[in-house]
């Protein structure tokens, strides 16, 4: 059978998803790590914080509910985020670490440290690390009643 006429193969152009920058220049994003004792969120935005680039939670990576906040789930979530950032051309991240805060605990959950380590190990450059846990100047009353939580 003879080849068809009029059908020419078009050259595919390579389209970069990320910003156009010089070689060796860092493109920064902001990584918001929210580590509670029930889950860990790894959320990357642009520098303004308005445009979400990628968001993965520990619960998206593991099946059991009890493992959502584990360091392993946080590590898997951070690796996913780092891979997606590299695809989009983001090479460096500023970290904003957050615990539950308010009138609850001000210490980050178990996934915070491992998420940060996984980001660094996966080749992302780390800019500034900041703790943005909400700390009240004078809080509302904590739950548990007058005599506290009885175990």
Curated annotation (Swiss-Prot):
Annotated SUPFAM superfamilies: Translational machinery components
Any one GO CC term of the record: cytosolic small ribosomal subunit
Residue positions where Phosphothreonine is found in the record: 133
Keywords noted in UniProt: Cytoplasm, Isopeptide bond, Nucleus, Phosphoprotein, Ribonucleoprotein, Ribosomal protein, Ubl conjugation
Composition-biased stretches (Basic residues): 142-151
Pfam families: Ribosomal_S11
Positions bearing the Glycyl lysine isopeptide (Lys-Gly) (interchain with G-Cter in SUMO2) cross-link: 61, 63, 106
InterPro entries listed in its UniProt record: Ribosomal_uS11, Ribosomal_uS11_CS, Ribosomal_uS11_sf
Cross-referenced Gene3D superfamilies: Ribosomal protein S11 (3.30.420.80)
Membrane-spanning parts: none
Chain residue ranges for the region called Disordered: 131-151
BP-aspect Gene Ontology terms: cytoplasmic translation; erythrocyte differentiation; maturation of SSU-rRNA; negative regulation of transcription by RNA polymerase II; ribosomal small subunit assembly; ribosomal small subunit biogenesis; translation
Modified residues (Phosphoserine): 16, 139
Family, as annotated: Belongs to the universal ribosomal protein uS11 family.
Subunit structure: Component of the small ribosomal subunit. Part of the small subunit (SSU) processome, composed of more than 70 proteins and the RNA chaperone small nucleolar RNA (snoRNA) U3.
Name of protein: Small ribosomal subunit protein uS11
């Amino acid at each position: 059978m003879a080849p068809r006429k009029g059908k020419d193969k078009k050259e595919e152009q390579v389209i970069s998803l990320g910003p156009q920058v010089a070689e060796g220049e860092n493109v920064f994003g902001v990584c918001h790590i929210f580590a509670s004792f029930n889950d860990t969120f790894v959320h990357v935005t642009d520098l303004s914080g308005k445009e979400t680039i990628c968001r993965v939670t520990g619960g998206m990576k593991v099946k059991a509910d009890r493992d959502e906040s584990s360091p392993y789930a946080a590590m898997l979530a951070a690796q996913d985020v780092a891979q997606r950032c590299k695809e989009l051309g983001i090479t460096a991240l500023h970290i904003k670490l957050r615990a539950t805060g308010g009138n609850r605990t001000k210490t980050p959950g178990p996934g915070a440290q491992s998420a940060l380590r996984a980001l660094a190990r996966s080749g992302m450059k780390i800019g500034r690390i900041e703790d943005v846990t909400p700390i009240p100047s004078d809080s509302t009353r904590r739950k548990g009643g007058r005599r506290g939580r009885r175990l």
